From Swiss-Prot:
This is Cell division topological specificity factor. Prevents the cell division inhibition by proteins MinC and MinD at internal division sites while permitting inhibition at polar sites. This ensures cell division at the proper site by restricting the formation of a division septum at the midpoint of the long axis of the cell. One of its GO terms (biological process) is regulation of division septum assembly. Coiled coil: none annotated. The lineage of its organism: Bacteria, Pseudomonadati, Pseudomonadota, Gammaproteobacteria, Pseudomonadales. Gene3D superfamilies: Cell division topological specificity factor MinE. It comes from the Bacteria. It holds the Pfam family MinE.
Length: 84
């Protein structure tokens, strides 16, 4: 999916294509977890605790991803904040 596909109207997808897309996401996530450092789950828990001091959120509203890009690592934190 490229950037322009995101803004176009989506056609109804068959349940098979939706299942395939979800499975690809799960497989990619599992592959990423294999190379994740041991401290990443603890880091995610602590980040959630800090965010909860200021905003009421669920665990599934915070995603922490560590990407290795050559000689550097990128820690990406995505937080879905509730409406005010």
């Amino acid at each position: 999916m490229n950037l322009f596909d995101f803004f176009r109207e989506r056609k109804k997808q068959s349940s098979a294509s939706i299942a395939k897309e979800r499975l690809q996401i799960i497989v990619a996530h599992e592959r990423g977890q294999r190379s994740a450092p041991d401290y990443l789950p603890d880091l995610q828990k602590e980040l959630i605790e800090v965010i909860r001091k200021y905003v009421n959120i669920d665990n599934d509203q915070v995603q922490v991803v560590l990407e290795d890009q050559g000689n550097c690592s990128i820690l990406e934190l995505n937080v879905t904040l509730p409406d005010r």
